[in-house]
């Protein structure tokens, strides 16, 4: 989904990926982000819980844009954060409890997203009004089902 979204704006964009295999090692994430910055990236996006704080720190040090994950991370880099993907775990837990109470819980993969209120995107004031509008239009289309985000769980190098 992330790469598809980026390519919808710029088909020639190159998305680089790095894996830290950690959700807590901020130093490792900072080193991975620094290597990507040295390789020419101009935006850092992480999906690594506390580990991602290191990636944000690298973006701040290099004075490039970054994107938060899991919660509103704008306070970590007020001048650099473009947006934050927010996971509303209370919605996920409520759905799970509801299925147990309704006696229809199954051991399966449950895909909850924006339409369910489980995920949202907080757009920062570092974005121009035009970019905010474009992003919000895409968000609204995802929520309504007009735009479907392909789920691809393939690991990439």
Stretches with model-predicted labels:
Residues 1-157:
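A residue-level marker of the well-folded mature domains of exported/periplasmic proteins
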